[in-house]
Regions:
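Flexible loop residues that form catalytic
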Residues: 21, 52-55, 115, 131-134, ...
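Short, acidic/polar
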Residues: 27-39, 106-120, 157, 161-162, ...
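N-terminal binding-site loop/beta-alpha segment at the start of enzyme catalytic domains
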Residues: 1-88, 108, 124, 169, ...
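N-terminal small/glycine-rich loop or linker at the start of catalytic domains
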Residues: 7-26, 86-101, 130, 134-144
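Active-site gating/metal-coordination segments in enzymes
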Residues: 95-130, 207
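Active-site mouth loops of central-metabolism enzymes
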Residues: 20-30, 96-111, 147-155
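Conserved, mostly hydrophobic/aromatic
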Residues: 6, 18, 32, 47, ...
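Beta/alpha (TIM)-barrel catalytic core signal, keyed to glycine-rich beta->alpha loops juxtaposed to Asp/Glu
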Residues: 134-314
Length: 314
């Protein structure tokens, strides 16, 4: 499988990245290890995880996904060296008081979270360490517009960048990235890095699919001009673009049992549960069938053949 370079970093990854947020919740450890084995066998060299996983986030499963991956590394000698490993430090609480008591994201918080991830992952370095979401108020997770009235006290970006730089200098992190960011955030991280000689962000991990084009609204130009690669998550629109909800809807009696969008109430209410999302997905899914494709093939092709996308998390 071909590889692409992430931003200006030395990381070269496959255009497919294995997402792991269900490991430890919907997917048990044995099945998770089987998925990791299969992914590596098929040539995927990129894994993404986060300290807050598994999803939906619960106190008992905090760190479960990283622990499962770490156990797999321990059972598969040499596997770690074949992979680009990405993880994320959680931002301030989104209903998760068990993470730093729901407080902000200081330099000390970033360092402590990284140390925890390294222990759970049973590795001495994380190739790409990302801020999962900003400490400041941003239009993300279903929020469409910025509202300055919702701003609260926050750690300066420069201070967060210095903490990440310390982790890079210590050899615990190779490169850094962002997630659920805005054009302002990406530009500010790059500007401060260049101004102060600090590590430059290589990536931004944001939602991107046929029914979520928020990235196209100026963030694509920002990342293109600053050479920051997009890691596209939710390329299947939380399952809406697979076609499995076309007939049943997402909350009806015919909804597939155990389906995430039906089970994860917060995600359904915040993002994918809007009627217009399913309506748009149904139209794309029908278009795929009319052209001899499965809905999933069309949805993934949209990302795989899009100049905006570096790697697609699936």
């Amino acid at each position: 499988m071909k590889t692409i370079q992430l931003g200006q970093s030395g990381l070269h990854v496959t255009p497919i990245c294995l997402g792991t947020m269900t490991f430890g919740e919907q997917v048990g450890e044995a099945d998770s290890h089987a998925i990791l084995d299969r992914s590596l066998e098929r040539g995927v060299n990129f894994i993404d995880t986060a300290e807050m996983y598994a999803v939906p986030a619960r106190a008992p499963t905090f760190g479960a996904t990283e622990t499962i991956i770490g156990n797999w590394f321990a059972k598969r000698p040499g596997a770690r060296q074949k992979l680009v490993l990405a993880s994320k430090v959680a931002g301030p609480s989104r209903g998760m008081p068990w993470i730093r008591e729901g407080k902000g994201m200081t330099a000390a918080d970033i360092v402590a979270s990284c140390e925890g991830s390294l222990r759970r992952l049973q590795t001495d370095v994380i190739d790409l360490y990302q801020i999962h979401w900003p400490e400041r108020h941003v239009p993300a997770f279903g929020i469409q517009y910025y509202d300055p009235a919702k701003e609260t006290a926050q750690t300066p970006i420069h201070e967060q960048l210095q903490a990440l730089a310390g982790l890079v200098k210590a050899g615990k992190v190779r490169h850094i990235g962002l997630s659920n960011e805005t054009p302002y955030g990406v530009h500010e991280f790059v500007r401060l890095a260049e101004q102060h000689g600090l590590p430059r962000v290589a990536t931004v991990q944001n939602p991107y699919c046929l029914i979520n084009r928020s990235y196209d609204n100026a963030l694509d130009e920002t990342c293109h001009r600053l050479n920051v690669s997009l890691l596209a998550y939710s390329p299947l629109g939380f399952g809406l673009l697979t076609g499995k909800y076309d007939a049943s809807g997402i909350e009806g009696p015919g909804t597939p049992q155990g389906a995430r969008i039906a089970s994860y109430e917060s995600v359904r209410k915040q993002r994918w549960g809007r009627p217009e999302a399913l309506a748009a997905a149904r139209l794309y899914n029908q278009l795929a069938r009319e052209h001899g494709l499965t809905p999933t093939q069309l949805a993934l092709a949209f990302c795989y053949n899009n100049w905006r996308v570096g790697s697609t998390i699936i």
